[in-house]
């Protein structure tokens, strides 16, 4: 059953008023694949547009806070924490973005985590596209989530081998 449709098939916001208030956490991931030279410049902080990684972290945090403004029918949530980690994986020529979002509330924070990772990836693309137009944003997904009536979730995808 699709919970965002009423009995007449019209879209509506799900009523979460009767759900228990619990601790919620979700992690999402996005990878940005690029040319090795681009990754080197980015990690060294030598791209013309400035500190790409710091800007991407801020953009991801801002995006998580604005999720309900951008995703129809998404509940506005009182986020207690948004963290953005960006890891370089030279062997795969990519940056991996992992967002972690927490709140105490009646509904999960998966969309906020996905929004944070996605916008951080888009920011990296925007700031590095002058030197690498062939970048690819890939592997955007919820890694895990905790809290709520449906219990915990761990995505079955195996993380990339990070050995160099």
Curated annotation (Swiss-Prot):
<dbReference type="InterPro" id="IPR023045">
    <property type="entry name" value="MoaC"/>
</dbReference>
<keyword id="KW-0501">Molybdenum cofactor biosynthesis</keyword>
<dbReference type="InterPro" id="IPR036522">
    <property type="entry name" value="MoaC_sf"/>
</dbReference>
<comment type="pathway">
    <text>Cofactor biosynthesis; molybdopterin biosynthesis.</text>
</comment>
<dbReference type="InterPro" id="IPR050105">
    <property type="entry name" value="MoCo_biosynth_MoaA/MoaC"/>
</dbReference>
<dbReference type="Pfam" id="PF01967">
    <property type="entry name" value="MoaC"/>
</dbReference>
<dbReference type="GO" id="GO:0061799">
    <property type="term" value="F:cyclic pyranopterin monophosphate synthase activity"/>
</dbReference>
<protein>
    <recommendedName>
        <fullName>Cyclic pyranopterin monophosphate synthase</fullName>
        <ecNumber>4.6.1.17</ecNumber>
    </recommendedName>
</protein>
<dbReference type="InterPro" id="IPR002820">
    <property type="entry name" value="Mopterin_CF_biosynth-C_dom"/>
</dbReference>
<comment type="similarity">
    <text>Belongs to the MoaC family.</text>
</comment>
<feature type="binding site">
    <location>
        <begin position="111"/>
        <end position="112"/>
    </location>
    <ligand>
        <name>substrate</name>
    </ligand>
</feature>
<comment type="function">
    <text>Catalyzes the conversion of (8S)-3',8-cyclo-7,8-dihydroguanosine 5'-triphosphate to cyclic pyranopterin monophosphate (cPMP).</text>
</comment>
<keyword id="KW-0456">Lyase</keyword>
<comment type="subunit">
    <text>Homohexamer; trimer of dimers.</text>
</comment>
<feature type="active site">
    <location>
        <position position="126"/>
    </location>
</feature>
<dbReference type="GO" id="GO:0006777">
    <property type="term" value="P:Mo-molybdopterin cofactor biosynthetic process"/>
</dbReference>
<feature type="binding site">
    <location>
        <begin position="73"/>
        <end position="75"/>
    </location>
    <ligand>
        <name>substrate</name>
    </ligand>
</feature>
<dbReference type="InterPro" id="IPR047594">
    <property type="entry name" value="MoaC_bact/euk"/>
</dbReference>
